[in-house]
Amino acid sequence: MREVMLSECMNLLYESNFVISKPFGRSCFDLIAKKADLKLLIKILKNIDSLSTEQSEELLNIARILQAVPLIIGSRTRNSVMEEGAVYERFGIKAVTFLTFQEQVRGIPPVVYANRGGFFVNIDGKALKETREKLNISVGELAEFSRVSRKTIYKYEQNEANPSAEVAIKIEEYLDVPLIKGINITDYFEGVNLPKSREEAFEKILKEGEDFKVKVIEILGDMGFNLLETTKAPFDAVAEESKNKGDEVHNVLFTNIQETENEEIRKKAIIVDEISKIFNSHSLLILETRKNEDKKIMSMSIRELEKMGDTVDLIDFIEKRKKSKDI
C-alpha cells in the first residue's frame, strides 16, 4: 500500500512539472519536490499515527531551514480510514490522503479539517457578519437556525472559532452566501520547532560515540553556520548561512560527515548532492583524510575545513571547486 502511494505521488508530481528526488529509505521524508518557489518534503505513511516524535521534529526543523512545506500523505489513522477531502494534523504537520493531495496539486484545496470532536471548516467571519447585518438577521435568529449559541455566532464572526462542516453549511444556506474557505495544504509556514542547541546536538552525538562528527559540527558552528544535526535524513547535518538578518536569500549546505570513505558513503554523498541541486544549494562530504578526487562528489578533509575563515570562505571554496570540477 505504501509503495503504491509513493509511486502514485511521484507520477502526479512529475506530470505536474515538479522537480522530484529519488525516494529515500529510512528517512524522516520520502520525497523532495520543487516547483517554482514551492518546496515540499513529503512523508508517505499507511498509518499517519506511526510517525514518531523524533521523525516529526527533524522533518519540521529541516523544512524550516529549507523554507519548505512538510507534508504527510497517508490512508488511515490508528483508529479509522482517513476521510477524502479532509486535512489531518500530526505534530504540527498537515496530513492528507493521496486523492486530497492530488486535488490540491490540481488547484482544488480541501475545505474540511479534522480535530477533536469531528470535522470543521474555516469560514470568513467578516463576510458572515456583514451579510447577517445586511439581511437584518439577528444573532439570535441565526443561532437558533444553526442550533448553536449566540456566543458561538459572535466567535465565528470574530474568527475566534470555526464551525463544524454541518453548521457551516446551515449558515451558508440561511444567508445564501459562500463563507467556507479552502485550506491550502502547501502554504509555507515557519516550523513549529526550532533546531536544538549545539550543546544538545553534541550531547546526542557523543552518546553515539561519534567524536569526529562533533568536531566537524563545532568547526562549522564556529564559522557562523546555523546548524541542524540529523539522524533521520540522508545527510548528517544541514547548515544555513543567512547573508543578512531578515534576508530571504541564504545559502544552505548539506553535509555528510565520515571519518573514512567507502563505496556506500560515496553513493550516499551522490544522493545528497542531487538533493542540493533541487534546492540550488551545496553539498559537502567531510572526511578525516581526503584520499581520492571524485568528480561526482564535493569532498574536503577536516584539515582543509579548519583553514576556512568563515561561511563566505567555505561557500566560495565550494563554488570555485565546482567550476573546476564542472559539477
From Swiss-Prot:
The keyword Chaperone does not apply. Keywords: DNA-binding, Transcription, Transcription regulation. Gene3D superfamilies: lambda repressor-like DNA-binding domains. SUPFAM superfamilies: lambda repressor-like DNA-binding domains. Residues 139-158 bind DNA. NCBIfam families: PRK04140.1. Residues 128-189 form the HTH cro/C1-type domain. This is Putative HTH-type transcriptional regulatory protein Mevan_1514. InterPro entries: Arc_TR_HTH (IPR020886), Cro/C1-type_HTH (IPR001387), Lambda_DNA-bd_dom_sf (IPR010982). Disulfide bonds: none annotated. CDD domains: HTH_XRE. One of its GO terms (molecular function) is DNA-binding transcription factor activity.
